[in-house]
Amino acid sequence: NGQVVSLVGSKDFFDEEHDGLVNVTIRPRQPGSSFKPIVYTAAFLKGYTPEMTLWDVNTVFKSDPKNYEPKNYDLGEHGPISARMALQGSLNIPAVKMLYLVGVSRVLDFAESLGYSTFGDRSRFGLSLVLGGGEVLLLEHAHAYSAFANQGIQKPLTSILKVEDAKGAVLEEWKESDGKQIVERNAALTISNVLSDNNSRAFVFGLSNSLVLSGRPVAAKTGTTNNYHDAWTLGYTPSLVAGVWVGNNDNAAMKRGADGSIIAAPIWNAFMRRALEKTPVEQFPAPQPTSTNKPFLLGKGVEQIVQIDKVTGKLATEFTPPELVEN
């Protein structure tokens, strides 16, 4: 409904040495991979699907002013992989390819429609945008995710429910609005379906991780910036969104290995468990099945069986003896 039910702007408000007075929820920070769901949702709106195949192989992109060659967090490659698993495994190379397919300008349009106010001069952004190359505010970041949680409808943020005078007379009182359909419903249901699919992230994070709430469906994504300056976790149920940022107010790097899944996700998990412990379990509605006859979008047609000549190792021809032909 847009209500901000809890907000912590710093670890210790009275800690002057570490800028405790600074409210980091409204301070621009790079979001790392927690921005990937924005790009993938823009892709779903364009007609791409979670089942489509992306090639996770080292690739040089020459569309940026400088040749850009993104690397995965583990520096490895996974070959052909579904968009679903690429997002859930937080693979960087497929994410950049998805942004390339959708277009930087289209993604920025979509992000701004979700309420992000920090992008400004668009000429600053290239394909690294999908890896968190643009700064965001934690409050706006969580508000954007709320549209996914609410089947594409986003409602205005509010942190004040009622204003009374000294005698108790109500001067202003919050009334829930209908909100606005920012994201097409099925695209919102699709991104929630992907982000709540723990099995699809297990090949990187394992089945037992801090993005899981036992017995309760939850959609979540972590993020980490270069040199561990920022660690994020954003996640939601159909009725509650929570965002966590961990870092230093002076932008000093944290210790090596301080990524979102290690230091932000446990905080997010603990909050969500406590906040939801006496509430009913909610299910995410299933998205409508993909309607397309294009094998590429269905994750098919990426492999082809060919016949080779066992002697030469080359493609067999009509002149190759049958006993030397191998599939």
Residues covered by each model-derived region:
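Short loop/turn and capping residues at structural boundaries
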Residues: 54, 122-123, 159, 230
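Active-site-adjacent helix/loop patches that line small-molecule binding or acyl-intermediate pockets
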Residues: 54-59, 63, 73-116, 123-148, ...
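Periplasmic/cell-envelope proteins involved in peptidoglycan metabolism and beta-lactam response
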Residues: 1-29, 33-34, 46-52, 105-113, ...
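Short helix/loop segment immediately N-terminal to the Walker
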Residues: 120-123, 210
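A penicillin-recognizing enzyme superfamily signal
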Residues: 4-24, 35, 85, 89, ...
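Short, glycine/proline-biased beta-turn/loop segments that scaffold the active-site neighborhood
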Residues: 26-80, 156-170, 289
